[in-house]
């Protein structure tokens, strides 16, 4: 509900209400657009008598890797693994479709975050691919991403990420309150300006209060 990287799209398929869920940045936009356009052409007579999602999948879903599930836990986990979920009014079960479009870094690894083993990708300048990179590695339904706008002129995107079942709720409320209460015109130095704006001003503490990663 609160994660800004979880997006949904409502359809009317043959007179029946339907909804598609996908994690922003995980789905292939071109594939999902083509499938959505096809579903919108279906008429009521095309879905008359259908009561099972498996029958709908066999007729009108062309993804090679797709399946039906009745388990809500399996459905949620599959969405966070990159699959798209379709639910249609009057059909038992939901369809899971593999239309992944994982983001990948096309430039060099971060100069300040080199690793000897493991992946060499890093954060980029766009917030949606960065959220998808985090979601790709932390496939926990408790991972929540709250989107905020900061800066009365620049309207910079700021995302508050946390595990809902592990986070210190008092600290989370304080951080959220500071983000919502910021009164700045712009973040000229991006994350450095944001950290400077939300952290307490204590001149007598020489140690860093914020860690950065690329």
Could you describe each region identified by the protein language model?
Residues 1-214:
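Cytosolic regulatory modules rich in charged/polar residues
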């Amino acid at each position: 509900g609160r994660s800004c990287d979880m997006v949904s799209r409502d359809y009317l398929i043959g007179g029946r209400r339907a909804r598609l869920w996908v994690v922003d940045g995980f789905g292939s936009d071109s594939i999902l657009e083509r499938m959505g356009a096809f579903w919108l052409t279906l008429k009521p007579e095309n879905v008359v008598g259908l009561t099972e999602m498996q029958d709908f999948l066999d007729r009108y879903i062309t993804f090679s890797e797709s399946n039906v599930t009745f388990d809500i836990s399996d459905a949620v986990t599959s969405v966070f693994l990159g699959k798209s979920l379709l639910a249609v009014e009057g059909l038992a079960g939901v369809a899971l479709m593999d239309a992944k479009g994982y983001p990948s870094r096309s430039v060099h690894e971060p100069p300040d975050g080199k690793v000897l083993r493991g992946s060499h990708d890093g954060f980029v300048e766009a917030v949606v691919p960065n959220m998808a990179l985090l979601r790709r590695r932390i496939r926990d339904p408790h991972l929540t991403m709250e989107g905020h706008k900061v800066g009365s002129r620049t309207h910079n995107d700021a995302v508050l990420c946390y595990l809902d079942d592990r986070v210190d709720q008092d600290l989370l409320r304080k951080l959220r309150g500071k983000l919502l209460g910021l009164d700045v015109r712009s973040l000229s130095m991006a994350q450095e300006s944001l950290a400077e704006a939300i952290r307490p001003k204590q001149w007598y503490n020489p140690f860093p209060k914020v860690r950065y990663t690329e």
